[in-house]
Each structure stands twice: as C-alpha cells, then as structure tokens.
Amino acid sequence: MRRHTHHKHSSRKGYRRLLDRLAAHESVHRVATGRVKPRMGSGRPIAPISKVRRVESGLSITINTEGAVIDAYVVTDKPEEVAAWMRAEGLAR
C-alpha cells in the first residue's frame, strides 16, 4: 500500500520563487527556511517580506503568504547590500 506523506503546511510556489530569486543574488551564499507558522487574522500581506533583521550569518527574514508566515535565513557577507536590493525590488518594506 502506498504511504502518503503528511504535510503540516503546504509549500506554495510563490514563496519558493521568492527564495530562488534571493538565492540568485550574487552576494547571497545560501537561503535556508526556518519555522512555518499558520497566519493569524484576515489581513492581506503588505509586502512578501515583512521583516528583515541582521544576524551573525547575514539576514533573518519573515515571509508572508496567504496562509502562513515563514521564517527564513539569508547567508551573506554583505547584508546591507542584500537588504537594500530587497527594498529596491519591492520585496521588503
């Protein structure tokens, strides 16, 4: 009998494309996803990336989708450059 994998949260193509776009930036070494939490409330996301925080390895970002909030980490040695690029591209506020 075929076994089905239980997915706690669906992985949407929209935020996968966003992560691929971040990973394609020349200053980004790696992009890793963290926790996926259900989105509370009925409000729509203002920007795909709502929070950009500096951490030791680069940047910690929060991605808003229709049904979930995803924490991700952008490993880079030029976090200011990557954060400015995200704002210029309209990905972050």
What are these regions (language model features)?
Residues 1-93:
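Short, Lys/Arg-rich flexible segments
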